[in-house]
């Protein structure tokens, strides 16, 4: 009979074959769900599904992609976000240029 704290389905059962030939049950905590995009909610590629204790053992580059908002946004949402921000900056610069040209003519 397992110990009382092991009698829960929140722990996963791992069947381990011992050198003596018998099978024992080890109880481990389950893996977390995948990291998800903050905008669209899709699972993120390049972010491992590990518990925080196991994530601590990985180097920084193995924890998330090395791009802007890596580990927070998916590549598609990041592309849309960058296009939107750059286009708004360009439009603001054009508007400022039009105002300066109009002020110079009058």
Curated annotation (Swiss-Prot):
Name of the molecule in the record: Large ribosomal subunit protein eL34
Coiled coil: none
Record InterPro entries: Ribosomal_eL34, Ribosomal_eL34_C_sf, Ribosomal_eL34_CS, Ribosomal_L34e_arc-type
Pfam families named among the record's database cross-references: Ribosomal_L34e (PF01199)
Species annotation: Hyperthermus butylicus (strain DSM 5456 / JCM 9403 / PLM1-5)
GO molecular function, one term: structural constituent of ribosome
PANTHER family per record: 60S RIBOSOMAL PROTEIN L34 (PTHR10759)
PROSITE patterns: RIBOSOMAL_L34E
Gene Ontology biological-process annotations: translation
This protein's record includes keyword Ribosomal protein: yes
Keyword Ribosomal protein: yes
Gene name as annotated: rpl34e
Cellular component annotations (GO), alphabetically ordered: ribonucleoprotein complex; ribosome
Keyword annotations of the record: Ribonucleoprotein, Ribosomal protein
Family of the protein in this entry: Belongs to the eukaryotic ribosomal protein eL34 family.
């Amino acid at each position: 009979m397992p110990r009382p704290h092991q009698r829960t389905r929140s722990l996963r059962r791992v069947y381990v074959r011992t050198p003596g030939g018998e099978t024992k049950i080890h109880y481990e905590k389950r893996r977390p769900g995948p990291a998800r995009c903050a905008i669209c909610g899709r699972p993120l590629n390049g972010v491992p599904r590990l518990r925080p204790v196991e994530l601590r053992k990985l180097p920084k580059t193995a924890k998330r992609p090395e791009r802007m908002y890596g580990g927070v946004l998916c590549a598609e949402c990041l592309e849309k976000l960058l296009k939107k921000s750059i286009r708004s900056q360009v439009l603001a610069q054009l508007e400022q240029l039009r105002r300066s040209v109009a002020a110079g003519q009058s």
